[in-house]
Amino acid sequence: MAITKRLFKSFYRLLLPVIILLALAIVGVSIGFIYKTARPPKAKYLVTPEKYGRFSARGARVTDETWANRDGTSSRGWLLRGAEKSPAVILFHRYGADRSYVLNLGVKLNEATNFTILMPDLRAHGENPLVKNSSFGGCETDDAAAAIEFLKSLKSENQKNLVGQDIGVYGVELGALVALSAAARNENVKAVALDSIPANSNNLLNSTINKNFPFASSLTTKLAEFGTRAYFYDGCYKNDSVCEAAKQITNRNVFLLAGSDAPDFQTSTEKLSRCFPPNTHLETKTDLNPSGYSITNASLEQSEAYDQRVIAFFKQTLESSER
């Protein structure tokens, strides 16, 4: 019996360092996946207001703005001012994109409605981002609240409030997560357009991991999910269900868009349509090809048709709220 115990202890002492090293390796690899994914590749803006303004008088009026977030960091965005006390619309881009992806839509929306338009860079996105890490919708939701506060602080030339009471939000994929959460928190968000929305932050993270690390995707996604606990020790990462957020959006206008170019998010968007309360005015268009997820690869005709759908939604829902 004593010999057996000694053998077990010897085996345990030999095995314990291996277990510890293996655990540390798993933690290190999982954090490495998150580190890479939370810092998407950077690229130059597709177009800037300076270049856009050469062809559009309205585009030449876009200004570059910064404002404080609630956690002490800063956000930035392009702002196109509208008429005094008119609604404002915030356009949120998808993961891996930046504010230049929504500039054309923003200018056309302003031309059609004279609403104030804000086009922010989400965390870790755009040239030389002000915040280095994306949190896949967690702290970005707090940033969206700060963006609304920034809009409410704007003054017109007459030193009156530039933006009226009502706000609209539009988002694609990551941007859709942010837009929905912002609407759930703020009843002044009256019009919500969501394109290719993931079911939650894990759904977005897994999709991104699968694209960046396609080998053994099921294993890498599990490791990445595990790594979020350590990497986002500040609580920025939240895996809240979009269905639960949708249940809080009462008596609002919602437009859901999706397409076969992002089939996973097409499915999650269709499922989301069943989560809103009965008094939500809901429109759906989930058979697009392409959706806003890959609209930059579309023809001019497809891009124009998509933009006009979004513009018509905000024009109808927010202009009626002004009356």
Spans of features found by a protein language model:
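An N-terminal hydrophobic leader/cap segment in hydrolases
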Residues: 10-67
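Serine-hydrolase catalytic core
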Residues: 67, 75-78, 225-322
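The serine-hydrolase catalytic nucleophile loop
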Residues: 95-108, 268
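Alpha/beta-hydrolase fold nucleophile elbow
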Residues: 159-173
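Hydrolase active-site cap/lid region
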Residues: 181-235, 267
